[in-house]
């Protein structure tokens, strides 16, 4: 038996070494047939002696039992997006902003992979979990699917790595794998994937990991995330950290390069763009990062992106097609947007059949008519956009595009405020289109966060005339909800209960939920902190609004206009009458800010306090409420089923209290 255990260990190590040579070094050392022979021998031994199977065995990539749904995972550190530049002038301006603060620097450049961003965590060198980026704070647990990707090591190489390592990178589908996948689908008469990115995303989000295992996905790391202990010595440059990842067996693109000047970055960009079609994977630009970690730390971040990095996007791909007609859509704030119906055309990796014309000014600028041949571009390889008319191809029967004087949905008057490009329906919540979008926004996760109130549910509620305004949501009964498709009494009762829970919110969330133009989460929070009460907000004028942080003349005008409309005030009053409420925001004297300067973290389920209430009350006492535990955390509040944050706090020696202790502090 000892000999069998030894052979299994040797085969596992040998196959993992071959995987490293193949996927990381790009220098396979044995033929595929020999690899298959070794793998089959290992499978046979493990089948007979499963007790000797190792966690990093390549046989563990075949996939396991199908999941019912993906669990949500909170990232140890936010996964931010990148700002973009689209030409040399914009990149030069980006470089100037950096060097004005840091002096001379170098950049680490790499292809911008067009796949799905993921976070992979290793503990003691062993693959522990993986998650999608999601909204940057929370992603989906795709551990079992990522485990099937052959290029991702299940155990890090060597022994010189931290206790905990978070690897961030992109899951991609190589062109060869994409073509083979579509060939199989075509042979079976199944729907084809449009591009490798969609194929990678669809494959990674399969509830059955065996399907993911069959899709030949790849992975390239582009950064380190959280590392514990924090004192562990990492390389002092981004390139050096990528080399550390490579030494641990993690795949890193061979195209990564350090550039010491703007000219070298431009040269690198042009070279990658020229070779774009010959690369084995899809890319849509180049990512440029300040190489020195010390400079990255000093430059910091804006709300959702680092100041020290940017994506230098390739010029959008363009094609010609026919403009067959124009539809007019109405959005949440009443904006009437012309949408061009196009003869379907394949551009930038997708088939495009619609494109926005933005507004009447854009139609006039283009001089476009129905029947024209137009040039379509995917701006930033994302948003289809009409950029020009091919005038010489205009037919004799081309028709002018007439902007409607009345709303195409509710027949209310369409008005255009002087100085604004957008025309808007004046129907407000009387307009079904605005009503649907307004209520979807009201129920969304960052607003009142009504669990289970998805877009399709909202649309049915309005179509069946069960809801006319946000306040009507709080009058719904379970029996009425059963009128909706696929809504039994059990689901209806659960949804009504979720609506009732949502009545307890915060002033900031309530303001955001109202859907006031240009008032996002941050502005809503600033308004709540400044005015503290709804009555004070209602009584304010434009001059007062401008005194609030981040509120300029435009937002102030939108606020004043919103609060001057009787039907908006009626909606607000009805919401309050329906029981929507939030904890009072009281003026706190400086000496009463007992938690000023402290950083607190909440984890687990709070049974007596709403999490938003707890966060708001801690902030009123001067505390900063963070989303993750670090050595700078002063206190962790651990509710029921506390997980990794609690373990990390205990490891770092951070003070931990329960909900009862929190209530005592807040009272």
Swiss-Prot record:
Where NAD(+) is bound, by residue? 32-36, 81-82, 110, 133, 170, 289, 313
Keywords (alphabetical) are: DNA damage, DNA repair, DNA replication, Ligase, Magnesium, Manganese, Metal-binding, NAD, Zinc
Positions of the BRCT domain: 590-667
For this protein, the record's InterPro entries field holds: BRCT_dom, BRCT_dom_sf, DisA/LigA_HHH, DNA_ligase, DNA_ligase_AS, DNA_ligase_CS, DNAligase_adenylation, DNAligase_N
The cellular component terms of Gene Ontology attached to this UniProt record, alphabetical and capped at eight, are: cytosol
UniProt-listed GO biological process terms? DNA repair; DNA replication
Q: Which cofactor does it need?
A: Mg(2+); Mn(2+)
Gene Ontology molecular function, alphabetical: DNA binding; DNA ligase (NAD+) activity; metal ion binding
Report the active site residues. 112 (n6-amp-lysine intermediate)
Report the EC code(s) recorded for this entry.
6.5.1.2
The record lists the catalysed reaction(s) as:
NAD(+) + (deoxyribonucleotide)n-3'-hydroxyl + 5'-phospho-(deoxyribonucleotide)m = (deoxyribonucleotide)n+m + AMP + beta-nicotinamide D-nucleotide
NCBIfam families, sorted: dnlj, PRK07956.1
Family matches, as PANTHER family = CHROMOSOME TRANSMISSION FIDELITY FACTOR 18 (PTHR23389), DNA LIGASE (PTHR23389:SF9)
Role according to the record:
DNA ligase that catalyzes the formation of phosphodiester linkages between 5'-phosphoryl and 3'-hydroxyl groups in double-stranded DNA using NAD as a coenzyme and as the energy source for the reaction. It is essential for DNA replication and repair of damaged DNA.
The family assignment reads:
Belongs to the NAD-dependent DNA ligase family. LigA subfamily.
Please give the name of this protein: DNA ligase
């Amino acid at each position: 038996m000892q000999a069998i255990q030894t052979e299994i260990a040797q085969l596992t190590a040998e196959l993992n070494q071959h995987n490293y040579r193949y996927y990381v070094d790009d220098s396979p050392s044995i033929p595929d047939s020999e690899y298959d022979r070794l793998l089959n021998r290992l499978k046979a031994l493990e089948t007979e002696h499963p007790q000797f199977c190792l966690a990093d065995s390549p046989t563990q990539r075949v996939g396991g039992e199908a999941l019912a749904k993906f669990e949500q995972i909170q990232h140890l550190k936010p996964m931010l997006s990148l700002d973009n530049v689209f030409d040399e002038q914009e990149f030069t301006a980006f470089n100037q902003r950096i060097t004005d603060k840091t002096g001379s620097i170098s950049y680490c450049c790499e292809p911008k992979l067009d796949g799905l961003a993921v976070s992979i965590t290793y503990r003691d060198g062993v693959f522990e979990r993986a998650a999608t980026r999601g909204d940057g704070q929370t992603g989906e647990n795709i551990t079992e699917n990522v485990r099937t990707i052959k290029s991702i090591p299940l155990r890090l190489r060597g022994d010189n790595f931290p206790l905990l390592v978070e690897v961030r990178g992109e899951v991609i589908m190589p062109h060869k794998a994409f073509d083979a996948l579509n060939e199989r689908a075509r042979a079976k008469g199944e729907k084809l994937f449009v591009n490798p990115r969609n194929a990678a995303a669809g494959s990674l989000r399969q509830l059955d990991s065996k399907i993911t295992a069959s899709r030949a996905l790849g992975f390239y790391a582009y950064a380190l995330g959280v590392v514990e202990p924090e004192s562990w010595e990492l390389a002092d440059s981004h390139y050096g950290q990528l080399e550390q990842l490579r030494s641990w067996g993690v795949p890193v693109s061979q195209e990564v390069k350090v550039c010491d000047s703007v000219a070298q970055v431009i040269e690198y960009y042009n070279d990658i763009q020229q070779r774009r079609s010959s690369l084995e994977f899809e890319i849509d630009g180049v990512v440029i990062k300040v190489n020195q970690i010390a400079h990255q730390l000093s430059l910091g971040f804006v709300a959702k992106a680092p100041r020290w990095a940017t994506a230098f996007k390739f010029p959008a791909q363009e094609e010609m097609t026919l403009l067959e007609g124009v539809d007019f859509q109405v959005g949440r704030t009443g904006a009437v947007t012309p949408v061009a119906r196009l003869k379907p055309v394949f551009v930038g990796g997708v088939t495009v059949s619609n494109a926005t014309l933005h507004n009447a000014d854009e139609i006039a600028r283009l001089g476009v008519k129905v029947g024209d041949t137009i040039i379509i571009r995917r701006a930033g390889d994302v948003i289809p956009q009409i950029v020009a008319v091919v005038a010489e191809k205009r037919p004799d029967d081309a028709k002018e595009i007439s902007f409607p004087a009345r709303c195409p949905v509710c027949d209310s008057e369409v008005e255009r405020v002087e100085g604004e490009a957008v025309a808007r329906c004046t129907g407000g919540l009387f307009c079904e289109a605005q009503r649907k979008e307004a209520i979807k926004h009201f129920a969304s996760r960052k607003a009142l966060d009504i669990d289970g109130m998805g877009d399709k549910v909202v649309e049915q509620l309005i179509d069946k005339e069960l809801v006319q305004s946000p306040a009507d949501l709080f009058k719904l009964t379970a029996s009425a909800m059963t009128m909706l498709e696929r809504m039994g009494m059990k689901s209806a009762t659960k949804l009504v209960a979720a609506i009732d829970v949502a009545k307890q919110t915060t002033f900031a969330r309530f303001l955001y939920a109202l859907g006031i133009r240009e008032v996002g989460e941050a502005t809503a929070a600033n308004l709540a902190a400044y005015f503290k009460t709804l009555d004070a907000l209602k009584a304010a004028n434009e001059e007062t609004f401008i005194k609030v942080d981040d509120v300029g003349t435009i937002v102030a005008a939108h606020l004043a206009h919103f609060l001057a409309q009787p039907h908006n005030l009626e909606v607000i009053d009805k919401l309050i009458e329906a029981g929507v409420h939030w904890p009072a925001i009281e003026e706190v004297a400086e000496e009463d800010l007992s938690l000023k300067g402290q950083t607190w973290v909440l984890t687990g389920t709070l049974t007596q306090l709403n999490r938003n209430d707890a966060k708001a009350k801690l902030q009123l006492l001067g505390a900063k409420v963070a989303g993750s535990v670090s050595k700078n955390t002063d206190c962790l509040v651990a509710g029921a089923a506390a997980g990794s944050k609690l373990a990390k706090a205990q490891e770092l020696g951070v003070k931990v209290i329960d909900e009862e202790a929190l209530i005592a502090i807040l009272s």
